[in-house]
Amino acid sequence: MLKFIQNNREITALIAILALFGLLGVIDRQYFSLQTVTLIFSSAQILILLAMGATLVMLTRNIDVSVGSITGLCAVIMGMSLNAGFSLPVSCLFTLLLGMCAGLFNGVLVTWLKIPAIVATLGTLGLYRGFMLLLTDGKWIEGLPDELKSLSAPLWLNISPIGWLLMILVLAMAWILAKTAFGRGFYATGDNLQGARQLGVRTNSIRIIAFSVNGVMAALAGIVFASQIGFIPNQTGNGLEMKAIAACVLGGISLLGGTGSVIGAILGAFFLTQINSGLVLLKLPAWWNDFIAGFVLLAVLVFDGRLRCAIEKNIRQQKYARFLKNDKNNQVT
């Protein structure tokens, strides 16, 4: 049973989602509807994008705590570009390039300058947040065009254009990680860095790509934020990094690297967003969100650690039992 949970974290995350649906459905019968699912999916899009980027970084046994600041900075650049008269496609391109450059800078700090990821990204967290406030002078960006807001308007099956694009990105990343040698390079890099190098995996390139894609995903999250909210506060992106990491860990991405899948991370992001919807249903204050996200992260880490210890203990017991059995057979003969 323990080994099943460890090897099938996506299934356990899905079971948790269904169980929470059942619990909230008992409280409010109207919760059981397709509209509820699409609303949660719409609310989860920002966190899903951040979880996708964090998946690549965590698979390589690194961590990036600057994604919230990158999201805020990219949202600001998006809003300023549009208000300056640039078209929507050009503004999106500027934003994505900025996100990629921010992620690339993180990757260079970690890979080439050998700075621990947590230290490097803590530094860039403040750097990007400060740059964002310098650009806006601490003010909000308002008056965004309706063209941007239309990206998050419901389309077919009550899902927005961004929602459909997101599903395509999820499927593409899942296929790349599971079915290609390039994708397996992320797992190899996080599982055994030296061993991966001996097998010919370009580990430095893999890690830089992971951070760069993470930056692009944060930029996409900034675009989604601007389109959904319609304005950009000066605190955009605050605290999102913790929720992204919590979603990944909840979905089975190991902090030790080399384990997990993007599907699990997506399910973790959906579950955390579902908890937020439950708080609304229960009429609890919004500041419970961060508390619950932190509690879930801590609980999953404790559970994951205990689960690993239990599995390792069980493996040792089986190994010793086999040796003892062989010794008894030798004594009999």
From Swiss-Prot:
It is found in: Cell inner membrane. It comes from the Bacteria. The chain crosses the membrane at residues 14-34, 39-59, 70-90, 93-113, 115-135, 157-177, 213-233, 252-272, 284-304. Pfam families: BPD_transp_2. One of its GO terms (molecular function) is transmembrane transporter activity. InterPro entries: ABC_transp_permease. Its main location: membrane. One of its GO terms (cellular component) is plasma membrane. It is a multi-pass membrane protein. The complex is composed of two ATP-binding proteins (LsrA), two transmembrane proteins (LsrC and LsrD) and a solute-binding protein (LsrB). Part of the ABC transporter complex LsrABCD involved in autoinducer 2 (AI-2) import. Probably responsible for the translocation of the substrate across the membrane. Belongs to the binding-protein-dependent transport system permease family. AraH/RbsC subfamily. This is Autoinducer 2 import system permease protein LsrC. It comes from Photorhabdus temperata. The gene is lsrC.
